[in-house]
A protein has these predicted regions:
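N-terminal small/glycine-rich loop or linker at the start of catalytic domains
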Residues: 1-15, 110, 164-176, 287-300
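N-terminal beta1-alpha1-beta2 module of alpha/beta enzyme domains
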Residues: 1-71, 177-178
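Conserved, mostly hydrophobic/aromatic
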Residues: 3, 62, 93, 135, ...
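Hydrophobic faces of well-ordered beta-strands that scaffold small-molecule active sites
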Residues: 3-5, 39-41, 71-73, 101-105, ...
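Active-site mouth loops of central-metabolism enzymes
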Residues: 9-21, 78-83, 178-186, 302-306
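Internal, glycine-rich beta/alpha segment that forms the wall or movable "lid"
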Residues: 82-198, 214-218, 225-227
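A short, acidic, amphipathic alpha-helical segment used as a generic capping/interface helix at domain edges
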Residues: 306-321
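Conserved small/polar residues in nucleotide/adenosyl-binding loops
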Residues: 366-371
């Protein structure tokens, strides 16, 4: 199992903006130094807490400072931009990263972003599909372009000057294009079936209960099989809220106590989900009333904390429940205590992951030996 990083992010709204951006930058650079395989950041234009306004721009700002880690948009909210702008920016970014880009896409989940871009009352899922189809068509064909849709048109036919390069759009370095990644939130996601059928790879959100995260694998398998694509659990990424600290009392206090950035994170999410009728994500029983949801219960279910050994055991228990997956995405939270936050990432890479992978190897050997014995 690989370890990666994913942040929306969510910071206190009274935190200095420059400081929060620098902390997010340092988290990505630390992830690279620690050997994390990949890292993603979200984008939200109208949220003072979720305050990275362009995931592509943020990634571009750290491209030359990273060496090995793959960087991903997490995600580009497709209905909020013109497909030609997205195609050009992502193509350039892939070259800036020398092919280390993962292209994360979604319809966007922040209602105020949809409103500010004039999409609140439109079919954003339909816009999402049209936008990504146009982006891929731009990368597939040569100029001049004349791509027509319901929401956008892309054309350079009237102004094409091929001999001097005018009217020609850039293509990504990776061929035919960077891996396309989609975030998955809904249980039993039909959207994931369609995404998998197109060869896109899923990230299961860290704010999903294990009961619902495990429903994503069958949807992914169904989509792959419908298109005759190879089914590989290495392509499934699962995000989790994790805090590692060798002082167990301190671990619990930072994860669940007063002033915890983890509790703040889930308070923000719960408030939004309740407002927009999506609080079912936090319910084991879908018949449960919204008024019965308790922040404390949600945090206890979704935040993994403790010593390196304890966290490794909890992650293995989680894996046993949801099934095998290729990459565990360590969810980035506000660095309320910079030293504790950094140390947690270090322990995750240096202590937790080796124990997890040693355990997985032993289980695989045991399974292989058992199969050999059965076959004799």
């Amino acid at each position: 199992m690989d370890v990666g990083f994913f942040t929306m992010p969510i910071h206190p709204i009274d935190k200095d903006y420059k400081k929060s951006l620098l902390e997010d930058r340092h988290a990505f650079l630390l992830a690279d130094r620690l050997g994390f395989s990949e890292a993603y950041c979200g984008e939200h234009v109208t949220d003072a807490a979720e305050n990275i306004t362009s995931s592509a721009l943020f990634i571009a700002s750290i491209a030359s400072c990273t060496k090995n880690i793959r960087l991903g948009t997490g995600t580009v909210n497709m209905p909020n931009s013109h497909p030609a702008a997205i195609a050009g920016q992502i193509a350039m970014l892939d070259h800036m990263l020398d092919g280390r880009l993962n292209f994360g896409i979604s319809p966007g989940g922040l209602a105020s972003d949809a409103e500010v871009f004039g999409n609140l009352d439109k079919n954003r899922n339909e816009m999402f599909v049209e936008c990504i189809d146009m982006v891929l068509e731009i990368w597939k064909r040569d100029a001049p372009y004349n791509i027509k849709g319901k929401y956008w048109n892309v054309s350079t036919e009237r102004t094409q000057m091929t001999e001097i390069g005018q009217g020609i759009m850039q293509k990504p370095l990776q061929k035919p294009y960077p891996p396309i990644i989609c975030t998955v939130v809904a249980p039993f996601s039909k959207g994931l079936v369609a995404a998998a059928a197109r060869g896109w790879q899923p990230i299961s959100a860290n704010f999903l209960l294990p009961k619902w995260a495990k429903t994503h694998w069958p949807s992914y398998v169904q989509g792959c099989e419908e298109s005759g694509l190879e089914v590989d659990s290495k392509n499934w990424r699962v995000a989790k809220s994790i805090f590692v600290c060798e002082d167990r009392n301190k671990a619990k206090e930072y994860a669940l106590g007063n002033g915890s950035p983890y509790v703040f994170y889930y308070k923000q999410l719960l408030t939004k989900m309740l407002k927009h009728g999506r609080a079912n994500l936090f319910k084991e029983d879908q018949n449960m009333a919204d008024s019965d949801l308790k922040l404390e219960d949600i945090c206890n279910k979704l935040i993994l904390y403790g010593s390196a050994d304890e966290v490794a055991d909890k992650i293995l228990e989680f894996r046993e429940e949801v099934g095998d997956f290729g990459t565990l995405l360590y969810a980035g939270h506000d660095w309320a205590d910079v030293d504790l936050a950094k140390k947690s990432m270090e322990l995750m890479a240096e202590k937790v992951m080796p124990k997890i992978n040693d355990n997985i190897k032993i289980c695989l050997l045991y399974t292989s030996d058992a199969a050999d014995e059965t076959g004799r």
